[in-house]
Amino acid sequence: MVRNQSRCFLGIIITISFFFFLLSLPNTFASPTRSLCRSDQRDALLELKKEFPIHSNGSHHVTTLSWNKTVDCCSWEGVTCDATLGEVISLNLVSYIANTSLKSSSSLFKLRHLRHLELSHCNLQGEIPSSIGNLSHLTYLDLSFNQLVGEFPVSIGNLNQLEYIDLWVNALGGNIPTSFANLTKLSELHLRQNQFTGGDIVLSNLTSLSIVDLSSNYFNSTISADLSQLHNLERFWVSENSFFGPFPSFLLMIPSLVDICLSENQFEGPINFGNTTSSSKLTELDVSYNNLDGLIPKSISTLVSLEHLELSHNNFRGQVPSSISKLVNLDGLYLSHNNFGGQVPSSIFKLVNLEHLDLSHNDFGGRVPSSISKLVNLSSLDLSYNKFEGHVPQCIWRSSKLDSVDLSYNSFNSFGRILELGDESLERDWDLSSNSLQGPIPQWICNFRFFSFLDFSNNHLNGSIPQCLKNSTDFYMLNLRNNSLSGFMPDFCMDGSMLGSLDVSLNNLVGKLPESFINCEWMEYLNVRGNKIKDTFPVWLGSLQYLTVLVLRSNTFYGPVYKASAYLGFPSMRIMDISNNNFVGSLPQDYFANWTEMSSVWQRPMLTLDYKRNIAIPGSNYMGDDNHQDSIDLVYKGVDTDFEQIFGGFKVIDFSGNRFSGHIPRSIGLLSELLHLNLSGNAFTGNIPPSLASITKLETLDLSRNNLSGEIPRGLGKLSFLSNINFSHNHLEGLVPQSTQFGSQNCSSFMGNPRLYGLDQICGETHVPIPTSLHPEEPLLEPEETVLNWIAAAIAFGPGVFCGLVIGHIFTSYKHKWLMAKFCRNKRKTTIGTS
């Protein structure tokens, strides 16, 4: 019995032991436990946290907020450790705004086992310290988008394990050190947008290189033929430098190369493709903006893999070789700004994969071959600034993919016979300006419902503007300037309209300005100059918060420009030209108080809206966008000037040639950023407001042909940018400000103000007015007045002498009796009065 119990107990013990044995198996055969972060690594990171304090506007994506002693540093955000040794091997602080410099003593360089270091977008300043050479295990280094300066430290050569360097967008300069030759494992080198200079770049030893990007620096040497030894090179980008010499054809011998960008340098001479074989992998070749010349060699056909060929902005001449038809993979061909001539070769139209074709700014002529219709994949076509003639190519109307067309500055004279229209829903961007197009705008144009941009300006079009265009709600820019269009203006701005720019200037339009424009909430530019529009001032346009340019010049607008119940000001206005109309009335003193854009310092916008793709893109210095910029005609400095681009900071007011009266509003002085002010040819009265002296950037001021009086404010003489002044034909008086700006004006700028003086140096003897304000009790006399006064004195002299003799005789003969009688009578009166 006892033996059985013992056996039972022993069995239980064995069973339990076996159970625990099974539980221990996973740990027994598992890999060793991951080591915790080493204390020296943790302490170095905590010191680094103190060196890189958290900035108030720093990114919350990666921060050091999680870095504290209570947590294993290998689990900290941005930190990666070696699982076995507990050493920090990767540090990623992208967009951690440090606003500090890297010092040689930084605890960062105590992390000697780092393999991956990423400190981009950290606002790091100062130089790269030589201590960077201590991180000899680094394979990946990214310090891009900071504010680093100075030269590469020579110690960079110690990082012989480096495979990737990215220093994009800093201010590093000087030569690349020769120690760079030690980086034999380097695969990618990104130095774009710095200030590196110098001659030969020692890269030939770096045979592992696959990507070299030296763009946007100041390198000024030839491209060394030793680079042909880089047999793994795939992308070579050196645009925007000062590299010179012949085209480096040896690059084409590198069999692995797929992308070459040499644009915006100083390469010169003919281009040749050496002994390039048909096995070339090159897909992109960009040599634009250089000084290359001569003919394009037939051997270009050997680059059979080419997809993008950019030869624009050089001096190539002759005809495009027919062998180009062998480049069947081309989707982009850019030959603009050269001297190519003759007819467009039909070989181009065999490139059926072409999506982008740019032949602009050449000497191509004749009719565009109908075979262009074979380019069924074409989405953008630019034939502008050539000598093409005849009718517009039919493929433009028929294509279902062609959304961007520029045929401007040619001699096309007809829209052609339209047999078929393409996809009506495709958003289009057409520029047919500056041709010889005749007749009315065809009604079928309205079948294309989506136009982002349509430019028919500077042609010979007549008839009325198709009313159906008002249904094209996706219009952003419409330019019909300088034609012979007549009739009424359509209601372009129906509900939901995207119209942002409308130019119908220099036509024969009549009627009123459509009040539907109030629905154009995106309107920025409106130009109706030089028509026959008869209407009152559109005060209601003040509700358009983006309206920047308003030109009503040379129409028959009439009446006041101010209504107390409706006036809102023009807060976004930069250019207003309402000259040569029939506007009347006075302006209230606070008229310009709400023109806030005129008093704001203009800054180039970081981003702007791409209306076609509905995305944000880098801002432009000019009104409009990068593809289509607004233009304008203005009387500037007394000369009718055509501005093909409108600088964003260009701010102008022209109210000239009307019948405004009353005082010039004092609030004009609030427009501190105004550059050009023209109030001439009106009936303004009163003094010139001294507040004008507050417009410190004013360049031109024309107040001529008014009824202004008083003195010219002395403060105007301190406006250092004022270069063109006209105060002529007013009633001004007093001393003209004695300043360089006033002294450099023509005498005619002050004529018609006879009481102005201080013009001796300007006008010489032709106009020296009376300085009335110096000695008003003793006015200076003109020579003719002096002669007349002497004649008057001579005439009065004879009678004066006769009267004097008679009075003298009476006085001497009867003086005793007369004096006694007079004196005694007065004395008696005094005595009686005091008694």
UniProtKB/Swiss-Prot annotation:
Pfam families from the UniProt entry: LRR_1 (PF00560), LRR_14 (PF23598), LRR_8 (PF13855), LRRNT_2 (PF08263)
Keywords on record: Cell membrane, Glycoprotein, Leucine-rich repeat, Membrane, Receptor, Repeat, Signal, Transmembrane, Transmembrane helix
Mode of membrane association: Single-pass type I membrane protein
InterPro entries per the UniProt record, alphabetical: Leu-rich_rpt, Leu-rich_rpt_typical-subtyp, LRR_dom_sf, LRR_N_plant-typ, LRR_R13L4/SHOC2-like
Major location (coarse): membrane
Residue spans of the LRR repeats: 111-135, 137-159, 160-182, 183-208, 210-230, 231-254, 255-278, 279-302, 303-327, 328-351, 353-375, 376-399, 401-423, 425-448, 449-472, 474-496, 497-520, 522-546, 547-568, 570-594, 647-671, 672-695, 696-719, 721-744
Extracellular side: 31-790
UniProt cross-references to PROSITE patterns, sorted A to Z: LRR
Region forming the signal peptide: 1-30
Transmembrane segments: 791-811
Xref: SMART domains: LRR_SD22, LRR_TYP
Regions of this protein lying in the Cytoplasmic compartment: 812-835
Subcellular location: Cell membrane
Cellular component terms (Gene Ontology): plasma membrane
Superkingdom as given in the UniProt entry: Eukaryota
Residues modified by glycosylation: 57, 68, 99, 134, 182, 205, 220, 275, 377, 462, 471, 482, 594, 678, 707, 726, 746
Family: Belongs to the RLP family.
UniProt-recorded name of the protein: Receptor-like protein 37
Organism: Arabidopsis thaliana (Mouse-ear cress)
The encoding gene: RLP37
